[in-house]
Amino acid sequence: MGSATGHAMTSHESRSGNRGILHLFAAATGWFAVAAWGAEPQVTEGFVNAPVAEVWRIFTTSEGFLATGAAQAEVRLAIGGEIRSHYNPQGKLGDAETIVNEILAYEPERMLTIRIKQAPASFPHRDAVAGTWTVLYFNPAGENMTHVRIVGLGYNDSPASQAMRKFFAEGNRWTLDHIAKPYWPKCKLCEKESG
């Protein structure tokens, strides 16, 4: 095999050259992966003192979804199905303030993947929604306890995307805490202090 300088490459030079090309390719591929993925995922985790089946029901049924803090909800669990929710009790499902999440994938009682199909008209980060999606993982964590991991993906480094990421970091934390609260254990001291 010849080189650009016209001299024959030794076997060692050939291997080194190939390694250099591989390193360059790996670096370029790594850069592309970072550019394609953008910012780090937004991750929120928590535990709910309830079996996985119960926590799954909360996220995947119309009645259960009310436990997330929604005033109204309609869930159709299917690929391409929707989770429609409204957080204003005076609002109406289907109006401009309805949140519509499309179900992209699911594995019963293990994983649910959604994307925002329609953000509320008043949502300040509407322009940053495109290209984002969320994966929710449900894992047993001992007897009658579920570990929930919410991973928001598709964010980029733009100010609008980062503002939306912060919004969902706070909102997802609130939602998980809200879901978990009714299941918190009530020890005798806790009951005495709260009563």
Language-model features and meaning:
Residues E63-T98:
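Short beta-edge strand/loop motif at the mouth of beta-sheet-based domains
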Residues N49-A53, L77, L104-L112, Y137-H147:
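A short, structured loop/turn motif at beta-sheet edges
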Residues L153, K181-G195:
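Short, highly charged C-terminal tails/helix-capping segments
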Residues S122-E170:
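Beta-strand/loop substructures that line and gate deep hydrophobic ligand-binding cavities in soluble
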Residues T10-F25:
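Bacterial N-terminal signal peptides that target proteins for export
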Residues N49-T68:
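Amphipathic alpha-helical segments
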Residues H23-A35:
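Bacterial N-terminal signal peptides
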Residues T44-G46, Q72, T98-A105, G131-P140:
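Hydrophobic/aromatic beta-strand elements that line small-molecule binding cavities or substrate pockets
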